[in-house]
Amino acid sequence: MAVYADEKQRTFTLQTKNTTYQMKVDAYGMLLHTYYGEKTDNSDLSYRIPMDDRGFSGYAYEASCADDRLSSDLAPQEYSCFGTGDYRISALRVRNENGSQAVTLCYAGYELSRGKYSIPGLPAVYADETEAETLGILLRDPESGLEVLLQYGVLEELDIITRAVKVVNRTMGKVVLLKAASMCLDWLSGDYEWLTFYGKHAMERTLQRTPIAHGISAIGSVRGASSHHYNPFAVVCEKDTNETKGLCYGVSFVYSGEFLMETEKDQIDQTRLICGIHPDDFAWTLEPGESFDTPEVILSCSSEGFGKLSHNFHQVIREHICRGEWKNKRRPVLINNWEGTYFDFTGDKLVSIAKDAAELGVELFVMDDGWFGKRDDDRSGLGDWFPNEKKLGCSLKELGDRIVGLGMKFGIWFEPECISEDSDLYRAHPDWAVKIPGRKPNLSRHQMILDFSRKDVQDYILERLCSVLASAPISYVKWDFNRSICDKYSTSLPAEKQGEMAHRFMLGLYRVLDGMLSAYPHLLLEGCSGGGGRFDAGMLYYSPQIWCSDDTDAIERLQIQYGTSFGYPVSTMGAHVSAVPNHQTGRVTPLATRGCVAMAGTFGYELDLNKMTEEEKVEVKRQIEVFKQYYDLVSDGSYFRLTSPQDNNCVVWEMAEKDASKALISAVYQHVQTNCAAKFVYPRGLCSDASYEVSLTDLKGDKKDRMQKQVLTGAALMRGGLRLPGADSDYAAWQIYLKKL
């Protein structure tokens, strides 16, 4: 049993394998947060809450004749409200019909159930009755009648707790939600830091570690998507926490739209974290009887450092976010023509690339942007999802059949949420584009946004997508989104509901994705937003892999994939071998290094194989063989960050089988050093008393012996370390295979 409700002591305790989370109802009905951390018993932990009288921190009216020391401004609250005495960052803010913004939430009941709750129209962790339990706690404003249902999903074996909120208008009038966060989490004490993951286009999710100081710190997005700039995943940790030790808490927002994560350290050094939809673009009207569901937050806690925390998130995403046929099925090695041809291609040109790829073992050919409408550059054609048979020289079906005839699968690129001003769709439906009446729209990549908050737009796009998918043997779709949203306005919404547009857009996107996958359940969907501009748990609910970044440079990818790995498994990271000089940086890196880095992801190619030498093709064929050999480690192994690219010349990572039977260690030198010291790394996840054969993987296919095989115990490897081969040139890479004997 994972959820314990003690009606006598009025506590709710959530127990996972290694952690405990507890709440308590106080004498005045306030739901307090007492504890989240290492596993303990079900004892009432409210004794930890300080009861001190502090000036300018008020108390409830009912407490004036009793104990006036418990103030909402100081108490650790499970779901904080604006306007009634808590001056810290709040989770809920409303505008009542009389214009006031006050809300007081008091405990009104609870419900327990087996299995995991779901959220209408939104992605969420899923689990059956053997895997999860649900706790619902009902809070009510005694004055207005507004109700808030706090929902908790407990996946005991995974050390995962999920949270979501349903707000129900039980008042007699209209209520406007100005802020409705998915969670509030308070820490009574501790000197914390937090890890956030910032970036930009083509350089996403760079790790940043900063102290949580007095005042408010925040990350978020008002771009209509989770964005390249801040990822909706963060970690709060104690100061001495590292990969293998220390207490840390992870927060992942299961949402692909605008978000806000904010922390505040208050007057008595307590820390609060709020996570939810960004309130700047949000105002949701609830008529009497109507309700609003927030997106979900995934929480996990580890006392064994960032490595264990990452494993918790990797497992819940692989097993309880990713769905469908491709959740566990081996995904094909693909080649994408984008960096090989850009818009300049014909059907014959694509088939020639595919033919070379098939001979080398590539299993899926993906035709990227430029196959539809009038689309020879990025200035026109978006929205006209009809194959350009004149450009291709054949029908889409004929092209697909030719690809399939090579023994490959056929994939295709879409950008359904965007529209070109120079398109037949825009000329027919200019009101479908997102723009403010009387203002010239802001353009990005010469394109505008389709109003996915409108059901007629959703229905049209879904019909077009399904029509294209039905017309050819298409097994894969790359779903792109190449700009941020601004000029937010929908012609389908009245003025007072324009604050709903951004969230309705996201609900519309999820509806279309769900509709397409329901119609084509065998389809492999890869998410993309100019690379990693929408890399979040929400999109992973629909697409089990996401193009990690438009930056395909192997050395830059070390940083990008390192940061991404804190919250997301490598099996979700789209990673390709591209041409050199690299198209983003101009850097020339060895083919073996490019392959090694791409193998820390879904693995594929993005270049014109016709331009490769025969020696390079032999190396490509060998890379594909190696990746297939170690695929299980990539798809389901435990991932360890052995060194960081931020402070190490040699970047090393490990993927180990959960039963410790084998492991693959990959190392990339960012530059060569003269007369450098020996480099040791310390593998993890091995069996101490077992022996392992240690051998170098032949990435190049030339069968040269670059490291002598040896046999070492797991204890020796993990404590004595493994000496890596040195770098004989800039960007040298090695893969070392450990096999249990």
Model-assigned labels for residue ranges:
Residues 73-116, 245-257, 301-325, 362-369, ...:
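Glycine-rich, aromatic-flanked loop segments that form ligand/cofactor-binding clefts
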Residues 5, 10-17, 21, 31-264, ...:
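Polysaccharide-binding surfaces and accessory modules of carbohydrate-active proteins
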Residues 100-107, 284-303, 731-738:
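Short Pro-Gly-centered flexible turn/kink motifs
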Residues 671-741:
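C-terminal beta-sandwich/jelly-roll accessory domains of carbohydrate-active enzymes
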Residues 326-463, 476:
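Aromatic-lined carbohydrate-binding/catalytic grooves of carbohydrate-active enzymes
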Residues 243, 644-687:
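Carbohydrate-binding surface patches
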Residues 18, 165, 289, 335, ...:
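Conserved, mostly hydrophobic/aromatic
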Residues 393-395, 429, 433-590, 602, ...:
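Active-site neighborhood of glycoside hydrolase catalytic domains
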